Amino acid sequence: MAQKINPLGFRLGTTQSHHSIWFAQPKDYSDGLQEDQKIRDCIQNYIQKNMQISSDSGVEGIARIEIRKRIDLIQVKIYMGFPKLLIEDGTRRIEELQRIVQKEINSVNRKINITITKITKPYGDPNILAEFIAGQLNNRVSFRKAIQKAIELAEQADTKGIRVQIGGRINGGEIARVLWMKEGRVPLQTIRAKIDYCVYTVRTIHGLLGIKIWIFRED
C-alpha cells in the first residue's frame, strides 16, 4: 500500500505556514501546545454554541486560527468565511470571547487580543466546504448531491482541482465503505503545488462519517 503523508506537513515551509508562531524553552513547550489547543477549542465551542445559520451562506465556518505569543500578549487571528456572528454586534461578541478565552487558559499577566479576518472566497477553503457537506448530510441530503454541490461551490471559488472523500456507514449501510469524487487536478506529489487539506468528522443517525477534502489552488 502507498504510504500517504499529510499534504500540509509535506509542504510546511514552502506553500504552507505554521498556525502557531511562538518560541518556548523545551521544558515549557508542551504547556504552550496544550494552551494553544485550549484556545482553539474554546473559540470553536463558542462559535458552535452561538452559531445562527444565515440564509445567504448556510454555514459559519472557521478556516483556521493563528496564534502569536509575546511575553505580555497573545494575539489570535480567526480566519472565517462568514463572520457575521462575531461582527454583527460590533465589538461586544469579540470582547466576550476574549474574556472567555482568558478565563479558560487562566491568563493573568498576558492580554488576549482576538481579531477576525474575512476570507474573500470562503468555499475555496476545505474546512468550510467540509462543514457545508456535514450540514447537508445532517439534513438528509444524498451524499452524492452534497459532494457534487460542494465541488460546484469550490469551482466557483476559482480552484484548479478538488477531491472529496467520505468514509463510514454511508446511507446507513451495514458495511463501512469509502467513496470519493474528483474534479480537476490535485497533484499531491508536487511540493510547490499549493494544496489545502482537511479532515472533518460528522455525527449522523447512522454513526460517524469521516470527510477528507483536498483543494488545489495554484502552482
Curated annotation (Swiss-Prot):
Disulfide bonds: none annotated. Coiled coil: none annotated. SUPFAM superfamilies: Prokaryotic type KH domain (KH-domain type II) (SSF54814), Ribosomal protein S3 C-terminal domain (SSF54821). Residues 43-120 form the KH type-2 domain. One of its GO terms (molecular function) is rRNA binding. It is found in: Plastid, Chloroplast. GO terms for cellular component: chloroplast; cytosolic small ribosomal subunit. Its main location: plastid. It holds the Pfam family Ribosomal_S3_C. The keyword Protein biosynthesis does not apply. One of its GO terms (biological process) is translation. CDD domains: KH-II_30S_S3 (cd02412). The keyword Transmembrane does not apply. InterPro entries: KH_dom-like_a/b, KH_dom_type_2, KH_sf_prok-type, Ribosomal_S3_C_sf, Ribosomal_uS3_bac-typ, Ribosomal_uS3_C, Ribosomal_uS3_CS. Keywords: Chloroplast, Plastid, Ribonucleoprotein, Ribosomal protein, RNA-binding, rRNA-binding. PROSITE patterns: KH_TYPE_2 (PS50823), RIBOSOMAL_S3 (PS00548). Belongs to the universal ribosomal protein uS3 family. Part of the 30S ribosomal subunit. PANTHER family: 30S/40S RIBOSOMAL PROTEIN S3, SMALL RIBOSOMAL SUBUNIT PROTEIN US3C. HAMAP family: Ribosomal_uS3_B. This is Small ribosomal subunit protein uS3c. It comes from Oenothera elata subsp. hookeri (Hooker's evening primrose).
